[in-house]
Amino acid sequence: MVINFEELHPNERVELERNIFFSTLEQLKGWARSNSLWPMTFGLACCAIEMMGVGSSHYDLDRFGSFFRTSPRQSDVMIVSGTVTKKMAPIVRRLYDQMPEPKWVIAMGSCATAGGPYVNSYAVVKGVDQIVPVDVYIPGCPPNPAALIYGINKLKEKIRYEAKTGKQVTNK
């Protein structure tokens, strides 16, 4: 069906312009992906308690379209919260590799972002970004659930921006 805009009444033209939008397939996929993130929780220390609070009725992460998954094969976001030891590093990498593409990582808390108070220990990895690429860093010891929700919203913005521009946003 072809619509000739010149033949329409001005009010009809305005109404039609309000109800039609143009987009690319990549932008549509980015919008859909950003509004249906399925995070996999990987809690290693006290930050995990705050991460669990996001799933409670007070914060209700479900209202943002995000549902916690227990399997990496069903997840597209890995939230690493807590101290990552060198013994745990291969497991983090294996879980990341099992996630389907596209996949994103959120480092939650001082320990996950830079080693935290245990940074000088021989057994602690100095940031999960040495094992897997991190998309969003959430500082704090421990960060509160509102900070995690803010970080998830920042990840959504990043996904939409990358879909719109076609440019990969990196933290390095």
From Swiss-Prot:
Q: How does it sit in the membrane?
A: Peripheral membrane protein
What broad class of enzyme is this? translocase
Pfam families membership = Oxidored_q6 (PF01058)
- What keywords were assigned to this record? 4Fe-4S, Cell membrane, Iron, Iron-sulfur, Membrane, Metal-binding, NAD, Quinone, Translocase, Transport
Q: GO CC terms for this protein? A: plasma membrane; respiratory chain complex I
Q: Which reaction does it catalyse?
A: a quinone + NADH + 5 H(+)(in) = a quinol + NAD(+) + 4 H(+)(out)
* EC assignment: 7.1.1.-
Q: Does the keyword Metal-binding apply?
A: yes
Entry note: cofactor: Binds 1 [4Fe-4S] cluster.
**Its GO biological process terms?**
aerobic respiration; electron transport coupled proton transport
Decide whether keyword Translocase is in the record. yes
Which family, according to UniProt?
Answer: Belongs to the complex I 20 kDa subunit family.
What is the protein's known function? NDH-1 shuttles electrons from NADH, via FMN and iron-sulfur (Fe-S) centers, to quinones in the respiratory chain. The immediate electron acceptor for the enzyme in this species is believed to be a menaquinone. Couples the redox reaction to proton translocation (for every two electrons transferred, four hydrogen ions are translocated across the cytoplasmic membrane), and thus conserves the redox energy in a proton gradient.
HAMAP family, alphabetized? NDH1_NuoB (MF_01356)
State the protein's name: NADH-quinone oxidoreductase subunit B
The gene it comes from is: nuoB
